Amino acid sequence: MSEVSNEAARRRTFAIISHPDAGKTTLTEKLLLFGGAIQMAGSVKGRKAARHATSDWMALEKERGISVTSSVMQFPYEGKIVNLLDTPGHADFGEDTYRVLTAVDSALMVIDVAKGVEERTIKLMEVCRLRDTPIMTFINKLDREGKNPIDLLDEVETVLGIQCAPVTWPIGMGQRLKGVVHLISGEVHLYEQGRNFTRQDSTIFPSLEAPGLVEKIGEQMLAELREELELVQGASNPFDLDAYRAGQQTPVFFGSGVNNFGVQPLLDFFVEHAPPPQARETTGRRVEPTEAKLSGFVFKIQANMDPQHRDRVAFMRVCSGKFTAGMKTLHVRSGKDVKLANALTFMASDREIAAEAWPGDVIGIHNHGTISIGDTFTEGESLSFTGIPNFAPELFRRARLRDPLKLKQLQKGLAQLSEEGATQFFRPLMSNDLILGAVGVLQFDVVAYRLKDEYGVDAIFEPVSVTTARWVHCDNAKKLEEFREKNAGNLGIDAAGQLVYLAPTRVNLQLAQERAPDVRFSATREHAHVKAID
């Protein structure tokens, strides 16, 4: 096996998805704790608490206790290298999450035992479906009262349309929680207050028949458990690796992230069965991870990861080959050679200079405004990874300055923050307005907060008469020019220099489409095909 094949086979790159407050960030912390990446897990709850969760590193996230931007963390575990991408749980940040899901090989879905499948989980699941992403499920907060576990499996199967294969099963819950049974190994992991629940610090019985177990959980509970397990094993599906990897079956685990309980069986199973880096489609051909030459794509851009340095970092997923510090690459969109000198690896916000990276790894590239989401880097081959879209925003606001002298900083701030992809920035052709588009209201708050915090600009966002946006294309240059002249009042340019129709109403959009049958109006923009406009 080549060095690239060897290293690629060790990688497990995944994202955690959930509805807000299902305990995703807490679980992230615990996985890092087991991976030896952090010594002391910080709880997300107390906003003024001294320890903040490692993956919520932006000032606003620390203040509000919600994850707003996806973090990237890497840790070694059992001979494998795990790359964990945390995604925002808040509904308004769907696009950021969507793009993170394009950069992973599998996902972990976290469900609150009391709430079951929630609306945001359904949406994220649809995204995973588009790519047949393999999914494992962790049913969290077992230390609280919740729904019947059998009903929960039924709910996941019915609502999300995916087969469940329970791997661990709870022994009671809430006040009566006694532990979990591992349905494949037969082991019983006891739940005891004050334990860390590492392999070294937990009571594990080899089976339900093991002497001493009945004293721990009581005869009645053991009898109930045996009955329940008979029912579960009769009604549910055994784990099937091929069905899981095809995105048709989800292995299910139960536990309590905040208490570390049930997390290690999940992590052990994950590193053993989750897929290593997979082949990727490009505009020209399929790229296999084991190819010798480097290729990768940018799925996220983050401004100001380090307030002291006012920097912007492009997150690149390595798809094939080996990255080494200082290597020369081709930035396909611009056609320029770029030397990747100080690329970073991540442990949430702690960055280290990357000496090398392999397929499945995520590295950070310093970006001075020349790199966009969806950009491909190669060792010279001209190809572009596909399937990384920009969506048309659903809400629009005009930015207004309280201090008109800060216009330059405002333009710079809006352009840089929109590069991250959670908001989009438009400039109408016929006015000096600066219009911001987003998927949800929270994003405008975040931008206003960050403009003030990071750029020293006090701006307010007020309503503007734009209902929706469509990217416009036409193969006939003359017809496009005619369309541009007739509709100049409704046209604008986005941050990538693409022409966009900003429709004041849905009816207006319909009429414009009818009047210009040769012009294509699209609700998404595929990043792979965007060429830079000078």
From Swiss-Prot:
Ranges where the tr-type G domain occurs: 9-278
GO biological process: regulation of translational termination
InterPro entries: EF-G-like_DII (IPR053905), EFG_III/V (IPR035647), G_TR_CS (IPR031157), P-loop_NTPase (IPR027417), PrfC (IPR004548), RF3_C (IPR032090), RF3_dom_3_sf (IPR038467), RF3_GTP-bd (IPR041732)
Main location (coarse class): cytoplasm
An annotated Gene Ontology molecular function: translation release factor activity, codon specific
Domain of life from the UniProt record: Bacteria
SUPFAM superfamilies assigned to the protein according to its UniProt record, in alphabetical order: EF-G C-terminal domain-like, P-loop containing nucleoside triphosphate hydrolases, Translation proteins
CDD domains: RF3, RF3_II, RF3_III
A Pfam family assignment: RF3_C
Keyword flag GTP-binding: yes
GO CC terms in record: cytosol
Keywords, alphabetical: Cytoplasm, GTP-binding, Nucleotide-binding, Protein biosynthesis
Residues holding GTP: 18-25, 86-90, 140-143
Compartments (UniProt record): Cytoplasm
Function field: Increases the formation of ribosomal termination complexes and stimulates activities of RF-1 and RF-2. It binds guanine nucleotides and has strong preference for UGA stop codons. It may interact directly with the ribosome. The stimulation of RF-1 and RF-2 is significantly reduced by GTP and GDP, but not by GMP.
Similarity-based family: Belongs to the TRAFAC class translation factor GTPase superfamily. Classic translation factor GTPase family. PrfC subfamily.
Name listed for the protein in its UniProt record: Peptide chain release factor 3
Encoding gene per record: prfC
